[in-house]
Regions:
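Beta-propeller fold detector
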Residues: 9-31, 79-85
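Hydrophobic beta-strand positions in blades of beta-propellers and related beta-sheet-rich domains
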Residues: 14, 66-71, 120-124
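Signature of short aromatic-glycine-proline-rich micro-motifs recurring in repeat-based ectodomains
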Residues: 31-45, 94-103
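Conserved blade-ending motifs and adjacent loop-strand segments that build the rim/top face
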Residues: 75-103
Length: 133
């Protein structure tokens, strides 16, 4: 969904991506298509100006991890999933909200929540360690 911040309460101004027509469709949510073929929860995204890429992070319950993908355009194509954190190392993890400090530089900062202890942690991933980033 795309909209200006001044239009947040005006749903008729919202635009929805449609991959079949390869364009944004204004005011018709039913025309929206899926951007990422994956189980996505607690999604956040940011444009990293240093690397000129969109970064999307989300919780995937099936893989029990926090996943990251990148794309040169917000509409894709999106990279294969990259695991930022997993439930084997961080039991009962969820959430994956990207911190605004990630807009530039070689680090991705994101918050990760855990049920036990019930808390939120600031995490850091080095983008250079992610291969073809």
């Amino acid at each position: 969904t795309l909209f200006r911040s001044t239009d947040i309460e005006n749903k008729t101004a919202y635009e929805y991506w449609n991959a079949f027509t390869n364009q944004w469709i204004k005011g018709n949510e039913n025309e929206a298509t899926v951007l990422i073929e994956d189980k996505v929860g607690e999604l956040s995204f940011i444009y990293n100006e240093t690397h000129k890429k969109w970064i999307i992070a989300y919780f995937n319950a099936d893989r029990y991890n926090i996943t990251m993908r990148t794309a040169e355009d917000i509409t894709g194509p999106w990279s294969e999933p990259y695991e930022l954190a997993n439930g084997r190392e961080y039991a009962q993890l969820y959430g994956s909200y990207i911190h605004p400090l990630s807009v530039t530089g070689d680090n991705l900062y994101f918050t990760m929540s855990m049920w036990m202890p019930y808390n939120v942690f600031l995490m850091k991933a080095e983008l250079a360690d992610m291969g073809e980033f």
